[in-house]
Amino acid sequence: MLIYSDIITGDEIISDSYDLKEVDGIAYEVDCAMIEEGAVQVDIGANASAEEADEALDDGVVKVNNVVHSFRLQSTQFDKKGYLVYLKGYMKSVKNALKEQGKSDEEIKDFETKASAFAKNVILAKFKDWEFYTGESMNPDGMVVLLNYREDGTTPYVVVWKHGLKETKV
C-alpha cells in the first residue's frame, strides 16, 4: 500500500486504497463516502426482557467523511483573498521542495503553469462550494485538502495537489 504524505509537514493525506484520479497533471481527485462512526453494540448477556423499559441512550452515531476521518484531517476556513495568500506561499514551498528533489527547471515551470490554471479554472471558479481541511498537525504551511460534491450533490470528493505529496510504501 502507498501512503501519500504532505512534503512540507509530513502529515498523511491520502493512500492508494482510495481510487486516485489524476486531473490535468497537477492534482488527484478521490471520491469519498459518508460513513457512520460510533454505535458499538455490546452484548453483556443480560436478559433484556427481564429488565425495565429499554433505556434510550444516544448511541453516538455520527456520519463522517471516510477520507477526512481516516487521515484525521482538520476543518479550516478561508475567504477567497485569504486562500490566495495561502496558495501563493504554499506553491512557493512546493516549488522549493521540487528544486531540492532535483527536478529540472522545465518540470518546475510546467508545475507552476498547471497549478495556476487549475487554481483559476477549478478552485476559484467555484470557490464558495469548497470545504477546506488541513493535515493532522494543523500546520498552516502544509497542504490544504479541498472537499466538494459531484454534480449529483451527494457524492463527496477531495482534491489534493499531486506535487505536494511524497509517496511512501508500507
Curated annotation (Swiss-Prot):
Where would I find the TCTP domain in this sequence? Answer: 1-170
PROSITE patterns the UniProt entry points to: TCTP_1, TCTP_2, TCTP_3
* Family under the similarity heading: Belongs to the TCTP family.
Tell me the compartments it is located in. Cytoplasm, Cytoskeleton
- Species per Swiss-Prot/TrEMBL record: Neurospora crassa (strain ATCC 24698 / 74-OR23-1A / CBS 708.71 / DSM 1257 / FGSC 987)
The UniProt keywords, alphabetically, are: Cytoplasm, Cytoskeleton, Microtubule, Protein biosynthesis
Q: Name one GO biological process term.
A: translation
Q: Name one GO molecular function term.
A: calcium ion binding
On whether Protein biosynthesis is a keyword of this UniProt record, the answer is yes
Role this protein plays:
Involved in protein synthesis. Involved in microtubule stabilization.
What name is this protein filed under?
Translationally-controlled tumor protein homolog
